[in-house]
Amino acid sequence: MKVYFNNSCKICKAEIDIYKKQKIQEIDWVDITNNISAEKETLKSDKELLRRLHIKDNEKVFEGAEAFLLLWKRMPKYRFLYNFFKLPIVFNIFSIIYEIFAFFLYIKNKKQLKN
């Protein structure tokens, strides 16, 4: 499983650094900052990658709240988050809140785009 994240975003980096401490061997952490290969692997533009967290697992790309669910499911310490946020009503609310938060992070970080 590959997790595509923005290492240049302080908030994103802080959260991912917490997850990296779990040292899950099956997770490959990929910084999307100026990373053409990340764009090719995910078939996403730099803008799309900057906008949301992405995960590629078994050749399928997940993004946003769905990507977080997959990440938490693979991390024993955070599986309780998966079990809670996968509930349909909770997931719908989480997705909306995630999109709002991700939008503001995107606005803050879009200067990183190549144009």
Task: Name these PLM-found stretches.
Residues M1-Q25, I97:
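Local sequence-structure signature of Cys/Sec-based thiol-disulfide redox active-site neighborhoods
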Residues A38-N115:
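Thiol/selenol-based redox catalytic cores and closely related redox-interacting motifs
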Residues I27-A38:
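Thiol-based oxidoreductase modules, predominantly thioredoxin-like and allied folds used
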